[in-house]
């Protein structure tokens, strides 16, 4: 039968949720013409948020690249950066990303004990990372190398501090989510939050690897 009937508009074959036949569309679980599932729409919106966040960090990276040599005769990255501590931070954050993925898999299996355990481990690794970062900032400020010392340090504190702020907010999100999971169980909205948190944490890992390479490694060698 033709898609165009009397008094009705033609059906869009590319509409989200429409299959090529009469069965369910594999991406949404709905029949042709049906709406996308809540999981798909939330994940899509969260990816847009992550992309906007990456664009923001791109601006910080660009500013740092321009100002990295503007030390105003003050300390440089080679004078300030302790690669041993930064390597430890990197190991902690990468490991926390792995345990965060395990927490997401455990939540999909509806294993409360495993999900809570891996979320807790993820939070502990993230808190240890943040502690080392705050310790680094405090040491630099005590050595008169604060953000007001030079344009280079302003760009450094802005970039690394923004990432640290994201980690801190992620830890607050993690703690809230653990409480919700304990009280409400594996509701669909809780599972979506665990999935989105895992995406967020992986994105912070990717950004940190870029910071570790472009800021610390290159800065300590120049």
Predicted regions and their residues:
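...captures the hydrophobic TM-helix bundle architecture rather than a specific catalytic motif
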Residues: 1-222
């Amino acid at each position: 039968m033709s898609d165009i009937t009397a008094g009705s508009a033609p059906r869009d074959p590319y509409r989200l949720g429409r299959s090529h036949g009469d069965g369910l569309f594999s991406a949404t679980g709905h029949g042709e013409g049906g709406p996308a599932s809540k999981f798909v729409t939330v994940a899509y919106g969260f990816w847009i948020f992550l992309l906007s966040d990456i664009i923001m960090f791109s601006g910080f990276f660009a500013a740092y690249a321009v100002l990295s040599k503007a030390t105003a005769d003050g300390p440089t990255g080679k004078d300030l950066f302790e690669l041993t501590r930064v390597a430890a931070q990197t190991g902690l954050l990468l490991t926390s990303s792995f345990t965060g993925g395990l927490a997401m898999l455990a939540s999909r299996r509806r294993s409360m004990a495993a999900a809570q355990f891996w979320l807790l481990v993820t939070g502990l690794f993230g808190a240890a990372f943040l502690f080392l970062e705050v310790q680094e900032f405090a040491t630099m400020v005590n050595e008169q190398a604060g953000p007001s010392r030079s344009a280079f340090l302003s760009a450094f504190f802005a970039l690394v501090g923004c990432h640290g702020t994201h980690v801190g907010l992620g830890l607050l999100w993690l703690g809230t989510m653990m409480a919700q999971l304990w009280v409400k169980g594996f509701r669909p909205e809780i599972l979506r939050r665990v999935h989105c948190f895992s995406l967020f944490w992986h994105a912070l890992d990717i950004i940190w690897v870029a910071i570790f390479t472009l800021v610390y490694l290159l800065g300590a060698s120049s």
